[in-house]
Amino acid sequence: MISFNNVSKLYESAGQSVHAVEDVTLSVEKGEIFGIIGFSGAGKSTLLRLVNMLERPTAGTISIDDKDITSLSTKELRKLRQRIGMIFQSFNLFNSRTVFGNIAYPLKLAKVPKNEIKERVNELLKFVGLEDKANYYPEQLSGGQKQRVGIARALATSPDILICDEATSALDPETTTEILNLLKKVNREYNLTILLITHEMHVVKEICHRVAVMEKGKVIEEGKLFDVFTQPKTKTTQNFVRSVINDHLPESVLAKIQNGGQIYRLTFTGEETGQPVLSYIAKNYNVDVNVLYGNIIELQNVLFGNLLVELQGEQREIQKALQHLRLQVQLKEVEAHAS
């Protein structure tokens, strides 16, 4: 659907060249929700602006449906932009227009007949749950309602692609969840390809099928959501994942670890999370199990959990228990000070 091929964007600043995007190669499949995460200045927003040619790449090509959009004429580019909807962190609504007027605006620009505009806007108002707010002005709406208007407006021209630029960053946690659920509904019912950028890993966790991590203009890691979360390769990705899955031992727990114990990280995936592996080794081997820390989350309907445990007992019995555990779960010995 969307392909970035060795794309770079270079800016000149104070006589120096700055790579906002550097040699990025990515593919976004039709109908998927693809997240791009990174800290401020990573190049996320620049990459999004390249998709609808608000910025042009310095090098490389960008294709949509196998067509190079960097070579489009002005007329072709105008048609392309009608296929791309966009929602923003700051909503970008017209304060002088009603909710109805804001949603109708892109349809008027496209010279859609009035009766069709009314029908389409009413359909979208119902879809985003704002049927009773058609004649309200933005100042009368909450942040979540404003973003619902933004989503409806972005959908007005029946686009194939929806770009989300930090769409939930200005919202409280409860409203963020509501908007993410609405975006999942958009993806599901309209089969829309969604490309979103964020600096919040919990947003990626809740909604994305695949994710790319950007740092200093480069994509440093990319893959399926489950793979990136459960096997993060770079330090930056590991830090993002830890904002959702905290696997560090608290100091208060570290202080309680008895001398001579051995600490292991047990990783459970899917059906493994329901297996009573610890009670089994406690019953069948002369080993005491001290659970130090643990968590479990759901990623794309698959459970993923971590446990940090201390095993105490004779070394021979511990080794037998470890041999059994390795057959059941992923197992790694950790140092107490590194946990």
From Swiss-Prot:
SUPFAM superfamilies: ACT-like, P-loop containing nucleoside triphosphate hydrolases. It catalyses: L-methionine(out) + ATP + H2O = L-methionine(in) + ADP + phosphate + H(+); D-methionine(out) + ATP + H2O = D-methionine(in) + ADP + phosphate + H(+). It is a peripheral membrane protein. It is an enzyme of class 7 (translocase). PROSITE patterns: ABC_TRANSPORTER_1, ABC_TRANSPORTER_2, METN. It comes from the Bacteria. ATP binds at residues 38-45. Gene3D superfamilies: 3.30.70.260, P-loop containing nucleotide triphosphate hydrolases. PANTHER family: AMINO ACID IMPORT ATP-BINDING PROTEIN, METHIONINE IMPORT ATP-BINDING PROTEIN METN. Part of the ABC transporter complex MetNIQ involved in methionine import. Responsible for energy coupling to the transport system. This is Methionine import ATP-binding protein MetN 2. The gene is metN2.
